[in-house]
Amino acid sequence: LYHKAPIMIANQVVESLQDNEMFESVEAVMPGFINIKLNSEFVAKYLNDMKEADKYGCENKAPETIVIDYGGANVAKPLHVGHLRSAVIGESVKRIERFMGNKVISDVHLGDWGLQMGLIITELECRKPDLVYFDESYTGEYPEEAPFTISELEEIYPCASAKSKVDEEFKEKAHQATLKLQSGYAPYTAIWKHIMKVSVEDLKKNYGNLNVDFDLWKGESDAQPY
């Protein structure tokens, strides 16, 4: 079957579907696509049967516990259309599974670890070298307020990323900052917490506008202890 031209395979599929009441028309077109038009009467009856059935035709079975990881936003970066797509699809799947009686645990699973954090820290030091986080002699408490807004943060990362592609010294400093953060260096951990707080607050607002919510706000950093 597979050692043939795509249009020949498409024609064979079309031939096998010709008498199926589900379709009003099925045709093969070059170079091997199949155009299908559903039978409106079949669709109407199918949907009406679902409407009349208990739970829209969902099977009655023992409830399961399901974990759905969707969202996948990166902290310090704005959401893009790919994040919106996965959020809407994941939220839909979550609601359907709950409607079916299953226990569903949703997790946003943030991209909150790795080199992107080192890039932000290094760029922040370039811009604001007088911050206490970069004073090795500082032994006091770190500020509760973040030294940046979400707008500044979303501008810092792409700038740092672009700089790392042309400045080897900057890139190496970012790698070292990443290593220090992941080794538990207190000043960088404090900056990371600021990044998380500012970013997550903004993400919750944006996801809320989509009526998307998560039970868990875990991220890549949660695997660090393991």
Question: What is the role of each PLM region?
Answer:
Residues 1-226:
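NTP-dependent nucleotidyl-transfer catalytic core
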